Amino acid sequence: MPAISFQSVSKVYPASGRPGSRPLQALEQISFDIEEGEFFGLLGPNGAGKTTLISILAGLARPTSGNVRVHGFDVGSDFAQARRYLGVVPQELVFDPFFTVREALVFQSGYFGLYHNDAWIDELLDGLGLADKAKANMRQ
């Protein structure tokens, strides 16, 4: 079973409603598998659909057609299970330089539905060797 599987995934964004606007075909019948342990790079010019593809994988957007599975779990119908296997790092992390390292992690984890996770943040800080920096401001 592949770690990630895209099967006939298409995404059409509706017309904006402005005069002359038309629907935008961002993805058309994309199919591929990524096996566990395999390295995979997603390259392409602006507007090629990379962000749309990742947004669908992360459950932030829904495909117009097709399905995406993560370790066999459908991202649309088994999102909670699929999400356990995913980690998405946004292109640009937004943080307040006056936050402590701990506060920044709490804030960012909230974007991904991870609330009340002090034990996990402690484990993360320890694992990264940053436990002594937890109370330091991000700008330091």
Predicted segments with their positions:
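Walker A (P-loop) phosphate-binding loop of ABC-type ATPase nucleotide-binding domains
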Residues: 45-49
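Conserved ABC ATPase "signature" region
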Residues: 106, 110-134
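Short hydrophobic beta-strand immediately N-terminal to the Walker A/P-loop
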Residues: 40-42, 54
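Helix-to-loop junction immediately C-terminal to a conserved catalytic motif
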Residues: 58
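Conserved ABC transporter NBD signature motif
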Residues: 66-77, 81-82
